[in-house]
């Protein structure tokens, strides 16, 4: 755990054991735009890495970047993103405009794409230029504790290279976290399981 500021955190572990009821590592960056690198192999059950976020820790103007976030496989658990409150998988049941974002689509649980057309047709590339509008749109169309993920172009070259995870907080500022280099998230889940490409949120 660290305090305020833009911290760099590196954690290297081996293959984690199937021990229940505990976490192998709990990483809390605190406020600021933290850069977190984690190297490990999760267990089939029990031990995983947990990345913890309080409201205000990782926001649109300064968000955390995680390299080495492991998704679930057919035999291994996913790492955990532990937000304040109890995370739920969002659905985007409404489509209230915000900035340039006027429509959205959710093809699998918790995974969203966005368009600047009134009727969703083509998914926009989300990058630093339109990120604030996407976060505003998610805030306008999700409930408190709802969590969504979407592909993100972190370099501005027009190609999505990472995944951003959004959590609707009770206060005015919502949480977003970048899973750097991770583009294969299939669904968000609230109970860890052996399902390929799922990301565990809590």
Model-based region annotation:
Residues 1-108:
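Acidic, glycine-rich calcium-binding repeat modules characteristic of RTX/beta-roll
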Residues 77-79, 107-202:
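Low-complexity acidic/polar repeat-biased segments
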């Amino acid at each position: 755990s660290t305090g305020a500021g833009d911290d760099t955190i590196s954690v290297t572990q081996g293959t984690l054991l199937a021990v229940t009821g505990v976490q192998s590592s709990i990483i809390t960056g605190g406020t600021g735009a933290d850069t977190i690198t984690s190297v490990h192999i999760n267990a089939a059950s029990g031990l995983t890495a947990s990345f913890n976020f309080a409201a205000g820790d990782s926001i649109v103007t300064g968000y955390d970047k995680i390299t080495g976030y492991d998704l679930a496989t057919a035999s291994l658990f996913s790492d955990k993103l532990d937000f304040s409150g109890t995370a739920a998988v969002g659905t985007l049941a409404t489509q209230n405009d915000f900035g340039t974002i006027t429509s959205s689509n959710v093809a699998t649980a918790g995974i969203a794409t966005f368009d600047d057309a009134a009727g969703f047709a083509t998914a926009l590339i989300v990058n630093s230029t339109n990120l604030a509008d996407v976060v505003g749109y998610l805030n306008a169309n999700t409930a408190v504790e709802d969590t969504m993920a979407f592909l993100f172009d972190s370099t501005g070259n027009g190609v999505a290279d990472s995944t951003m995870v959004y959590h609707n907080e009770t206060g005015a500022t919502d949480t977003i976290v970048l899973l750097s280099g991770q583009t294969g998230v299939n669904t968000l889940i609230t109970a860890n399981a052996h399902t390929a490409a799922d990301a565990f949120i809590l």
